[in-house]
A protein has these predicted regions:
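C-terminal accessory extensions/subdomains outside the catalytic/core fold
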Residues: 721-745
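Short, charged, amphipathic alpha-helical segments
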Residues: 684-692
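Extended, well-ordered protein cores
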Residues: 2-270, 278-503, 508, 512-524, ...
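Ligand-binding pocket scaffold of soluble enzyme catalytic domains
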Residues: 675-678
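Alpha/propeptide regions of enzymes that mature by internal proteolysis
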Residues: 394, 692-693
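Short, solvent-exposed positions on alpha-helices
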Residues: 630, 681-685
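A glycine-biased, small/acidic residue-tolerant capping/turn segment at secondary-structure junctions
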Residues: 702-719
Length: 745
């Protein structure tokens, strides 16, 4: 390829990473230009996705392209090079807030229909649903996942260990999960013998056949699953666990993944809320229905709805809700100071973030009195809950992990083409009546998989195509060979879906030379125990997992090792030949935005962006023959190492170095590395003046960046902030701006 293909697409997303991008993008372009590299942007923020979904409601001047769909097509091109930052996986509450903000800016979007009745309302709701939950990743992830802690970051964590609370063998913290009636115990699976088109239907006891999904096209070799969770068993489980927590005096917490599992987990969440506040719902249920209360969206939804009632009625309802707490366990808090509980919103406590944080804190979460306490962590679905209990058991026996000595656990994740549960949203349903749920071949009428379900049960179909499985096995072998680490496939032979995968893994491993490699297949609990026993001895182990465990483990282990998952290197080798580079494995940090608005200090650490950019440049250099890009990559890696060694990352404290200052130091170190490299004298000459200007102005720039802190700022919105105001806030150093401008003139 020629250097004409030297293009990087940098995503514009949400919250803290979007703010950091406003400062970092001009730096990237300054360094990329001399190497002939174009840096384009693609706005996939929740606001842009909403606007892209409703062009027919906008004026010509307001219309924006459907950038997510366009970027999805780009992932299918062999020269794709995409840097993907964390974005909001919008809950219903967040989506409504974003819609209202856009409406307030003059966009005449339709209101979000919470209880759609007419065909028009149902159509609008369907369009909005495409913007909800994890709407971005399934579109872009056309490859499997390779996530690991870069060597420089791991070494920094060893030299500068983050805090880890002590574990006590007397800790009462534990995980509670269902032992029957959940998806694990209600799963059937098969591998398709040929291409098929199937429909999902319910043969009701009433004699009525309801087609829930008329058509899904499947390929030969694809693994499909039919699984259901019993509403009755779920509610009985909640009753038992709430009562147990109350009797034993341990704090109660509920951990779901309502952002990614945007259909099933809000339902699972809502049942718990209703049972916890049963007496209040029994007394006011009819009124709540009239108001359109939907506790699948949390107690915040209930409080919003009752705000329209007379004050006396509001007070009565609140008294009845508070009265429920008298015979209920203490609830874990999201924000003790503000009285925000675990039940406030389903996306406030997300399992892959909340469980590692709890384990890091010695098995404790915050109570209403602002103190850390032992906790019952309720995770209804047993499929993956047991891995957390295994880690808790390990910590109770061995104590807390030591970041100075512990090994590392990279991950190779089966992710491509909406693999497994994370691709099941459009195939997940609440059973409208008792009956038999069938997956039926449209052409022949053959019933492929069948389940007996009851009203309110959650039934879903999952799928994973054969090509991604082959690619996943290949990636695991490659990483094991390149790293010298043992690789463990976390697969449970007693789970039907994973038993089908085990057959394929054993078959496709034969396609590779595995001589001298340590590759094993273990059930999740055994794999966790094996990995932890190595970790505490300072040994490294690759986890090779399905899509959900990819998500969970790439938060769990990095938070133990590094203190955060945002510092992970996350590479998605796209199956069409391109590459996508995700900046870390964490979220988009709304609290960082709050601090910026209140104090003009952004604590977001762009280390993930620095590392992703280096790999992106290296890949671009290899694939296009652009030697200058390779030099940029090597020098950026060196600059990032220097940044860590000199401790120039952002501080959480206002008045100290923040994201903007950290980015300045990265730019200065990068320019210095380029000015001293000798491989390309022309590049050396181009960057030498920039390196000198930045070094000479270090004191002035750092002073200008510090001077603006400590005062509130206006960025003109939250989901749709004003670009000009954001730029003014994020680029406050006139000296730095002038130097960058002169370098690209």
């Amino acid at each position: 390829m020629s250097n004409q293909n030297s293009t990087i697409i940098y995503t514009i997303t949400d919250e803290a990473p979007a703010l950091a991008t406003a400062a970092f993008l001009p730096i990237i372009r300054t360094f990329a230009k001399p190497a002939g590299i174009a840096v384009e942007t693609s706005d996939i923020s929740v606001a842009a996705r909403i606007l892209g979904e409703f062009p027919d409601y906008l004026t010509d001047a307001q219309k924006v392209p459907n950038t997510l769909a366009e970027l999805g097509k780009k992932t299918l091109e062999p020269d794709a090079n995409i840097i993907k930052l964390p974005n909001i996986s919008a809950s219903q509450n967040q989506l409504i807030a974003a819609i209202r903000e856009l409406q307030g800016k003059g966009y005449k979007l339709p209101d979000f229909p919470e209880n759609p009745q007419t065909d028009e309302e149902k159509a609008i709701r369907q369009r909005y649903n495409r913007c909800m939950g994890s709407a971005v990743n399934p579109v872009l992830r056309e490859g499997n996942s390779d996530r690991r802690a870069p060597r420089a970051v791991k070494e920094y964590a060893r030299k500068n260990p983050h805090s880890m609370a002590e574990w006590s063998q007397a800790s009462r913290t534990h995980v509670s999960h269902m032992h029957h009636g959940d998806f694990y115990h209600g799963e059937k699976s098969m591998t398709l013998d040929k291409d098929r088109e199937v429909r999902m239907e319910l043969l009701g006891k009433s004699g009525k056949t309801t087609v829930l999904k008329p058509s899904t096209k499947l390929l030969a070799g694809e693994v499909i699953d039919s699984m259901f969770m019993s509403k009755k068993a779920l509610c009985e489980f909640y009753e038992k666990e709430i009562e147990d927590a109350h009797k034993t005096g341990v704090m109660f917490s509920l951990h779901v993944k309502a952002t990614m599992m945007k259909v099933s987990h809000p339902i699972v969440f809502g049942h718990c809320v209703k049972i916890f506040y049963r007496e209040a719902f029994e007394k006011h249920g009819k009124l709540f229905d009239e108001l359109g209360v939907n506790v699948n969206n949390g107690m915040a939804n209930l409080y919003d709805k009752i705000a329209t009632l007379p004050q006396s009625k509001q007070d009565e309802i609140k008294r009845d809700l508070h009265a429920c707490h008298e015979h209920r366990p203490e609830l874990a808090m999201v924000d003790s100071a503000k009285g925000i509980t675990n039940f406030h919103s389903p996306n406030d406590i997300i399992v892959d973030a909340s469980m590692p944080a709890m384990i890091r804190q010695g098995g404790k979460m915050w109570g209403a009195d602002g103190r850390l306490k032992d906790v019952k962590a309720v995770m209804p679905e047993s499929t993956f809950a047991r891995i957390y209990q295994e880690m808790i058991n390990f910590c109770k026996w061995h104590g807390n992990f030591d970041p100075r000595t512990m090994g590392t656990v990279p991950n190779v994740g089966l992710m491509a083409q909406q693999a497994e549960e994370y691709g099941s949203h459009d195939k997940t349903f609440e059973a409208p009546e008792d009956g038999v749920a069938n997956i039926v071949d449209v052409a022949t009428g053959e019933v492929l998989l069948s389940q007996t379900v009851e009203t309110g049960d959650i039934w879903r179909m999952c799928q994973v195509k054969d090509a991604p499985i082959r690619d996943w096995v290949k990636l695991a072998v490659t990483r094991a060979r390149n790293s010298g680490m043992p690789a463990v496939f976390w697969l449970d032979p007693y789970r039907p879906h994973e038993n089908e995968l085990i057959k394929k893994v054993k078959l496709y491993l034969k396609d590779h030379d595995t001589t001298g490699l340590d590759i094993q297949i273990m059930s999740q609990v055994r794999a966790m125990r094996y990995t932890l026993e190595r970790v505490v001895r300072g040994l490294d182990t690759i986890s090779v997992t399905g899509n959900i465990l990819r998500d969970y483990l790439t938060d769990l282990f990095p938070i133990m090792e590094l203190g955060t998952s945002a510092k992970m290197l996350s590479i998605v080798p796209l199956m069409a030949g391109g590459g996508m580079y995700e900046t870390g494995a964490g979220g988009s940090a709304p609290k960082h935005v709050q601090q910026l608005v209140e104090e003009n200090h952004l604590r977001w650490d762009s280390l993930g962006e620095f590392m992703a950019l280096a790999v992106s440049l290296e890949d671009l250099g290899i694939k296009t023959g652009n030697e200058k890009a390779k030099i940029l990559a090597r020098t950026l890696d060196a600059a990032t190492g220097k940044l860590l060694d000199n401790n120039k990352g952002p501080s959480p404290k206002t008045g100290q170095l923040d994201n903007r200052g950290s980015q300045f130091y990265l730019a200065m170190y990068w320019a210095q590395e380029l000015a001293t490299q000798t491989q390309d004298p022309a590049l050396q000459a181009q960057y030498a003046p920039l390196a000198k200007a930045l070094a000479d102005s270090e004191q002035a720039i750092v002073g200008e960046l510090a001077a603006v802190q400590g005062k509130p700022v206006d960025i003109g919105g939250y989901y749709a902030a004003d670009p000009a105001k954001v730029e003014a806030v994020m680029r406050p150093s006139r000296t730095l701006n002038a130097i960058l401008e002169a370098a690209t003139a």
